[in-house]
Regions:
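Bulky hydrophobic/aromatic packing residues
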Residues: 24, 55-63, 92, 129-131, ...
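Alpha/beta-hydrolase fold catalytic core
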Residues: 76-107, 112-117, 123-129
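Helix N-terminus capping/helix-initiation residues
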Residues: 2, 31, 75-76, 159
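A near-ubiquitous, low-amplitude feature marking generic local secondary-structure context
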Residues: 30, 65, 90, 94, ...
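N-terminal leader/propeptide and maturation segments of large enzyme subunits in energy/redox metabolism
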Residues: 61-83
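Alpha-helix boundary/capping residues
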Residues: 1-5, 10-13, 74, 86-89, ...
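Substrate-access "cap/lid" subdomains that shape
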Residues: 1-69, 95-117
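Mobile gating loops/cap/lid regions near enzyme active sites that modulate substrate access
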Residues: 106-213
Length: 213
């Protein structure tokens, strides 16, 4: 299933409101939907990304009925494709993978591609670092914030590997604020059809994102 197909299905259940982005008249002179339709996304240097397990914390006891309802909006062919892609995961992991793609990853890829069409410099990342004993959370929504701002509170189990990833992320954010490029000496390629991104997980490295789901 393509990124666009997944987003279109999610959009059929979308209701404007809480999750709408602010229209700041600089990066977003209008709603993303309107800008994409008329190819009016402004040219900007943009760094954007998602976390690997955005929604896992919301799915601690997923049932087969829950999963069936989640798949109901897709065609039979699409349901088969999704099941094949996620066959090695348990129900909680399946629900997280699908909803993370619907809510975060696929919209972010579409936004990156729209910016790319407008000749913007686009840099993509995936945050995948997991703290010790975090199997029920993993790389959850918002987990990257203590790394970016180096605010690892005492109650958070923090290893030397976490500190290294934090240093890497701080450096990237500072570089981007200074120059519009988060990398150093070309070590972070711009986003393209190759789907290359920075993977923030010790040891952080450049890698290809899987766009199938």
């Amino acid at each position: 299933m393509s990124t666009l197909e997944l987003v279109e299905k999610a959009d059929s259940f979308y209701k404007p409101g809480y999750n709408d982005p602010p229209i700041d008249r600089w990066l977003l002179p209008g709603s993303p939907r309107e800008l994409h339709v008329r190819k009016g996304v402004p040219r900007r240097s943009v760094m954007l990304g998602t976390n690997e397990h955005e929604n896992l914390m919301n799915y601690a006891s997923t049932t087969k009925s829950d999963w069936t309802r989640q798949l109901a909006k897709y065609s039979e062919q699409q349901r088969t494709q999704i099941e094949q892609l996620l066959e090695d995961k348990n129900l909680n992991e399946k629900m997280d993978a699908l909803t993370t793609a619907e809510d975060f990853f696929c919209p972010t890829v579409l936004q990156a591609n729209a910016l790319l069409e407008g000749n913007s410099d686009v840099f993509m990342y995936r945050f995948a670092q997991e703290r010790p004993n975090s199997k029920s959370l993993r790389a959850y929504h918002g987990a990257e914030l203590p790394y970016v701002f180096d605010t690892h509170d005492e109650w958070l189990p923090t290893t030397s590997e976490d500190r290294t990833v934090s240093k890497e992320m701080k450096t990237a954010w500072i570089n981007f604020a200074r120059s519009g490029n988060p990398g150093e000496d070309g070590d972070w390629p711009e986003w393209s059809a190759d789907a290359i991104a920075m993977i923030f997980r010790y040891p952080s490295m450049i890698g290809e994102l899987d766009l199938k789901l």
